[in-house]
C-alpha cells in the first residue's frame, strides 16, 4: 500500500490561518511487511525512524493498537519552508491508521483529527482534499469549502534556510485595532471572491495588500522584495509568502511562468526555484 500527500501553500496573502492550496510536491509512505517494531526507512536527514516520528505519533494517536510495520518514507517537500511538510505527515499518519485499522473515517473526521493536531486547518485541509480550501476553526469546530483554483501557475522560490513557524509568529502583533481588522478582513473577502469567480487580477491585488501578516514577516525573508519586483515587472497576479515562509510564491498566467522562473534563477539567490501546479486530488491511497 502507498499513501501519497501533496505539499500545501497556506495563507495566500490575507487568508491568514484559513486559506490553502495543494501543490505538486509530494510525500509518499509505502507500507511494507509487518515487523516486531516500527521502522521507517528514509533519507530525510535527522528525523526519527521509530514511533517518535510525527507520522507514527499521529497514526498511533488515532489507532493505538496498530500492528507494527516497516515503512518507507519519501518526500520532496522541504522541511520548515512554508510548504506544509508537517501537515503532509499528519495527514499521511491519519490515513495510515485509517487503512491499517479499517476505521472508515469520513473526510470530515479526518479533517477534525488533523486540525486538532495541527492547530489550524489551512494546510491540512488542502492536503486532504486537494485544490483550494477555505476553512475556519472556531470553538473546536471546523467549517470548510473546497473549490477549484483558477487556471494559473505557481513559481516557488525555496530558500536554503529554514524558518520555523514559531519564530515567524513571534513577529506578529498580539492584536489589531478594530479599524485595522475591518480593513484586513475586507481585503481577504475580495481575495477569496476573486479566486472563487476566476478573477485573478482582482484577487492578486487583494493578495498583495494583505494586512494580517506579511508586512510583519517580510523582513525575515530577505529575498521577498526582489522576487516581488520580478513578479510585478512580468505582470504576475501576485507574490506572497507561502505559509509562515520562507518560501516565496509568484502567482501568474501559465504563459509567463517560464520567464519569471528564469528571471528569479538569474538572481543567483541561495535557494531553488520550482514551477508548480495545483494538485486536485489531495491524499490518495494505492493498494497492491
From Swiss-Prot:
Pathway: Amino-acid biosynthesis; L-threonine biosynthesis; L-threonine from L-aspartate: step 4/5. ATP binds at residues 78-88. It comes from the Bacteria. It holds the Pfam family GHMP_kinases_C. It is found in: Cytoplasm. Signal peptide: none annotated. This is Homoserine kinase. GO terms for molecular function: ATP binding; homoserine kinase activity.
Amino acid at each position: 500500500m502507498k499513501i501519497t500527500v501533496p505539499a500545501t501553500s497556506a495563507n495566500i496573502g490575507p487568508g491568514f490561518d484559513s486559506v490553502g492550496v495543494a501543490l505538486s510536491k509530494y510525500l509518499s509512505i509505502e507500507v511494507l511487511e509487518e515487523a516486531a517494531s516500527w521502522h521507517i526507512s528514509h533519507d530525510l536527514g535527522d528525523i526519527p525512524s521509530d514511533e517518535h516520528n510525527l507520522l507514527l505519533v499521529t497514526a498511533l494517536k488515532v489507532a493505538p493498537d496498530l500492528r507494527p510495520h516497516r515503512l518507507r518514507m519519501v518526500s520532496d517537500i522541504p522541511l520548515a519552508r512554508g510548504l506544509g511538510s508537517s501537515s503532509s505527515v499528519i495527514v499521511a499518519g491519519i490515513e495510515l491508521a485509517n487503512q491499517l485499522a479499517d476505521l472508515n473515517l469520513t473526510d470530515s473526521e479526518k479533517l477534525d483529527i488533523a486540525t486538532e493536531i495541527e492547530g489550524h486547518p489551512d494546510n491540512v485541509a488542502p492536503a486532504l482534499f486537494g485544490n483550494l480550501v477555505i476553512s475556519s476553526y472556531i470553538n473546536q469546530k471546523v467549517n470548510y469549502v473546497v473549490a477549484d483554483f483558477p487556471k494559473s501557475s505557481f513559481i516557488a522560490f525555496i530558500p536554503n534556510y529554514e524558518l520555523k513557524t514559531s519564530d515567524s509568529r513571534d513577529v506578529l502583533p498580539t492584536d489589531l485595532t478594530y479599524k485595522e481588522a475591518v480593513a484586513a478582513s475586507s481585503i481577504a473577502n475580495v481575495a477569496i471572491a476573486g479566486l472563487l469567480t476566476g478573477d485573478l487580477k482582482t484577487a492578486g491585488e487583494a493578495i498583495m495588500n494583505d494586512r494580517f501578516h506579511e508586512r510583519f514577516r517580510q523582513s525575515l525573508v530577505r529575498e521577498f522584495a526582489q522576487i516581488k519586483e520580478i513578479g510585478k515587472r512580468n505582470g504576475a497576479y501576485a507574490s506572497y509568502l507561502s505559509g509562515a515562509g520562507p518560501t516565496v510564491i509568484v502567482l501568474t498566467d501559465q504563459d509567463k511562468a517560464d520567464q519569471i522562473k528564469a528571471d528569479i534563477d538569474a538572481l543567483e539567490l541561495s535557494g531553488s526555484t520550482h514551477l508548480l501546479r495545483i494538485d486536485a486530488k489531495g491524499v490518495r491511497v494505492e493498494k497492491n
